Amino acid sequence: MSKETYLHLVTLLKPAIHQRNTKFRECVSAEERILITLRYLGSGCTFVSLGLYFARGDNTICKVIAEMTVIIWEILNGDYMPLPDVQHWKDIAARFDRLWNLPNCLGACDGKHIRIEKLPDSGSSNFNYKSYHSIVLMACCDSDRLLFTVIETGYAGRNSDGGIFSASRIKRWIEHGRLNIPLPSKLPNDQSNYEFPY
């Protein structure tokens, strides 16, 4: 990441970070909080190694990352991952049809295991078939640029992609019409008058 990009992130996120120094301790600055979080998200380092690198306690690192990921999502979500509108979905479907001959396809969905340290008192709930502890990121992306259109994360690694999708908000959003999905339409080169859902 360039210095300019980092400074731009600081400018965007700093107003939402509310920390004060006290008589007993100096708070972790907004700049350092952002650095800790970026290092964690970019490398997957353990809290212990981040604590050593930044000379902070493991619990402090854990708390900073938990707070900062929420702030990053709340501040940047609307600009960098807005909910697609009907026309955006139709553009994605047109690219799927043109590139892959898949008409009315709005995305490719899959789960990705994100390696984590074993959580305290979690037993084997995050232990996956690849023989490590993980949480699962369920995501849908467009046809060619591999840009996420919908994401959800936090499911225990032992769950299958199908099980996660069945229990996910993504599935509920689709079923309840909250994703601005276009109305059914005819398939290209189809002689019937049937309309098929996206």
Residue ranges, per PLM feature:
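Surface-exposed beta-strand-to-loop junctions
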Residues: K14-I17, G42-G51
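Short alpha-helical segments in extracytoplasmic peptidoglycan/chitin-binding modules
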Residues: S2, I36, L50
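Basic, low-complexity segments
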Residues: M1-C27
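Structural motif
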Residues: R25-E31, F127
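A structural signal for short hydrophobic/aromatic patches embedded in well-ordered alpha helices
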Residues: H8-L9, I36, I92
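Short, amphipathic alpha-helical "recognition" segments used to contact nucleic acids or chromatin
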Residues: A30-S43
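Short, well-ordered secondary-structure "scaffold" segments embedded in the functional core
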Residues: T46-Y198
